[in-house]
Design a protein with these regions (language model features):
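N-terminal pre-domain/capping segments
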Residues: 1-125, 202, 300-344
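Non-cysteine beta-strand/loop elements that form the S-adenosyl-L-methionine
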Residues: 5-12, 83-89, 112, 133, ...
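Active-site beta-loop-alpha junctions enriched in small/polar residues
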Residues: 12-14, 51-53, 88-91, 136-138, ...
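Gly/Pro-rich active-site loop or hairpin
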Residues: 15-36, 146-152, 182-193, 206, ...
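N-terminal cationic-hydrophobic initiation segments that often serve targeting/anchoring roles
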Residues: 39, 73, 163-164, 196-200, ...
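Glycine-enriched alpha-helix->loop->beta-strand junction motifs that scaffold or abut catalytic
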Residues: 42, 129, 201-203, 229-235
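Active-site acidic/histidine proton-transfer and metal-coordination neighborhood
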Residues: 67-71, 75-206, 216, 293-294, ...
Length: 344
């Protein structure tokens, strides 16, 4: 914990550099190796996909899944860490080629729900009630291929089944406007929280905001954070960065736009995010060109930048800023922010 915040990271955040145009550039690392790195860097928690906890999950019985989850719990405990989230990885399987909860094929929808319930069971074994739904394939390549209204109903139906499965589970929807789909059904936190209201227990359905996803939607991540926190529903956070409307870049936090990063920290500070107990996670990836020996630097650098920006946010002269606001002197306010970020 630094500056009062708890930090989390996922095993997929140490990746091998493959992109759609070329193969991997770094060797894969084992989970144990990654866990050692997380701990040494001062991370408090680990984010998991269901199959990060239980590899080849689809071929395993419910009992075997729980057993392997208990083994992971022990491993985490020995490292002095905890599981922050578990997320069903619903975008890899041949069953979910055309969507998971919103697939046109009822068998695919059933697969997605069954797998989500197993994810909740894994969470229970890990002592982790927060289930994240990144709705990767809940959208279309072709709008005429699905019915948008029906898709909302199907997502609500799926979430309701999860809520009924375990009364402790909380569902955090991670919105993203596109990629892998052309258009996604839950593109912003506003959409996620609106869907929450349709569910059987809206109090247990909230959101996870990712910087890059907000930017891909043409929105300011700080406003998205303020919006979710006005509802008390920002339950996790994926900080990273994104250079405009391109592919999802997952750059280190603050890498593309330091001022946008600063404003995200200001939003977290004014809303008391640290006090909610929720974690700050860095959903970041190394540049493909990164050498093996630097394969975790993007994460430690993100944490460093975060802590430095918390200091910048706390030392910002709010009184002077408010005076300029009252005087409608936004020119001076603009320069004040720039000079504060530049430092003395
Ligand atoms: C991809 C998402 C992805 C999720 C993760 C947790 O764009 O950000 O990394 O956060 O799979 O569900
Ligand atoms: Mg993410």
């Amino acid at each position: 914990m630094q500056a009062g915040y708890r930090f989390s990271i996922g095993p997929w955040n140490i990746s091998e550099g493959a992109d759609p145009y070329g193969p991997t550039t770094r060797a894969p690392k084992s989970f144990d190796w990654k866990l050692g790195k997380f701990k040494a860097a001062g991370f408090d928690a680990v984010m998991f996909h269901d199959d990060d906890v239980v590899p080849d999950i689809d071929g395993k019985s419910a009992e075997q899944i729980k057993k392997e989850a208990r083994e992971m719990k022990k491993k985490l405990g020995d490292a002095g860490m905890f599981a922050e989230i578990v997320a069903p990885r619903l975008w890899f399987s041949p069953n979910t080629i055309d969507g998971a909860y919103t697939s046109n094929d009822p068998k695919a929808r059933q697969y997605a729900i069954d797998r989500s319930l197993r994810t909740i069971d894994i969470g229970a074994e890990l002592d982790c009630d927060l289930i994240v739904l990144w709705l990767a394939r809940e959208g279309t390549y072709l709008r005429e291929s699905k019915d948008g209204r029906r898709s909302v109903e199907l997502i609500v139906e799926a979430v309701d089944k999860m809520l009924a499965h375990n009364p402790k589970a909380r569902i955090a929807i991670e919105p993203k406007p596109n990629e892998p789909m052309d258009h996604a059904y839950i593109p912003t936190i506003g959409h996620a929280l609106a869907v929450a209201q349709l569910c059987s227990d809206p109090k247990r359905v909230g959101g996870l905001i990712e910087t890059a996803h907000c930017i891909l939607a043409g929105l300011d991540p700080a406003d998205e954070i303020d919006f979710a926190m006005a509802f008390g529903k920002l339950w996790s956070l994926h900080l990273n960065d994104q250079n405009g409307l391109k592919f999802d870049q997952d750059k280190p936090f603050g890498s593309a736009n330091l001022r946008v990063a600063f404003n995200q920290i200001r939003a977290l500070e004014r809303n008391g995010y640290a006090k909610t107990g929720a974690c700050v996670a860095f959903d970041v990836h190394s540049f493909r060109a990164t050498k093996e020996e630097h394969c975790f630097d993007h994460a430690t650098n993100s944490m460093r930048t975060f802590v430095k920006l918390v200091e910048r946010a706390r030392s910002f002269d709010e009184k002077a800023a408010q005076k300029l606001v009252a005087d409608r002197n936004y020119q001076a306010l603009d320069q004040m922010v720039i000079e504060h970020l530049l430092g003395k």
